[in-house]
Amino acid sequence: MKSKHPNRDVVAVCVLLFATIAFFTFTAATTPSPSADLPGPQSNTAPEFTDPPTGKELFNRSCANCHGVDGKGVSVKQLGLETPPPDFTDCDFASREPDADWIAVAHQGGPIRGFSKEMPSFRDALSEGELKKIMNHIRTFCTDRDWPRGELNLPRPLVTEKAYPEDEIVFSSFIDMENNGAVMNELIYEQRFGARNQIEFVLPIGFAEQGNGAWSGGYLGDVAIGVKRALYHNIRSGSILSFTGEVLLPSGDEQLGFGSGTTVLEPFFTYGQILPAGSFLQVQTGLEYPVIQDRGENEAFWRATLGKSFNPNPWGRTWSPMVEFLGASTLESGGEHQIDIAPQIQITLNTRQHVMINVGYRIPVDDPDRDSHLMVYILWDWFDGGFLEGW
């Protein structure tokens, strides 16, 4: 069952991944209209120019009947509807989703994102440019600028932590594909509190292949608890920076390979950056510090992810191919260094786009004797609705 990974295979994978990312990042998605340079019809009468309506004027004209001039929403009794309009002044709600999702619902109607049919389509009444103006006005209803905008909630990589504070449940599996097989599953619960903060719990459960080929499992690993704080965010620059402090408790069995035998402190910074053409960059760097030094080594790690999100169908599911670069070094003199690469792709599964899957493969670059791992997760953004909603 032993397998080697020649360097030329790794180089070929890297070249293919970089070529794919570069193609999606630097090629334009629009095609100029063939009639763009043709002269229009001539007229002898002087044109009359009027100022285009503002976002506020468009909102009051097209949206305020249901959503209210103040953005708080008109009562369902007054409207005769079953679904209450959202409160745009509630920053906890209004800040989370990017403009693109709001415009999709307004342009195509509620069902395009798995919401009520009572939200009509405005595609015949308002252009996408006018909807963007309306969105700019809707953003003024949340007056607390402490809340990071939803555009900064970049796709979650398989290993690198996100900088954006979220409400998510993630079930992930890491499968050793070589030698004696092993599977480590993690159930991750994340809950946001306040504008910038998040608490996280990680429950790992492991399975291992024995020498005789039989499997044993259900072993508890080292449980982790962490708190994240967004230190800086700026929608204009497309940047977000966070700090997380995580504690790994020695709940796993060290002899079975599912625990470290000591409490481990793991502080780290995470950074997210929106790039042109739907691309993005995410970086994480931090330290691992075992409380009992005899049971572990101090380690520094860095992780970087480059990817791009796109929609083959303008209003359909989102595809996000990514490649992660993962490095770690022990801090003692003459310590070990490890570098891995992990190509992967995240896909939204339902129309509401709050349930996602990510599949990837982690490949050792510096040492072919280390095992490769198949990695996969299912992510549920539970703030946006139940797991079975929006399909």
Language model region names:
Residues 80-139:
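Extracytoplasmic electron-transfer domains, predominantly the class I c-type cytochrome c fold
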Residues 49, 56, 68-104, 155, ...:
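Gly/Gly-Pro-rich "capping" loops immediately C-terminal to redox-active cysteine motifs
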Residues 32-58:
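Electrostatic cytochrome c docking/interface patches
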Residues 14-25:
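Bacterial N-terminal signal peptides
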Residues 55, 59-70, 119, 134-138:
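The canonical Cys-X-X-Cys-His
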Residues 129, 145-391:
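Transmembrane beta-barrel domains of Gram-negative outer membranes and organellar outer membranes
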Residues 1-8:
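N-terminal secretory signal peptides that target proteins for export/translocation
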Residues 62, 129, 135-149:
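Aromatic- and Gly/Pro-enriched helix-to-coil junctions and flexible linker segments
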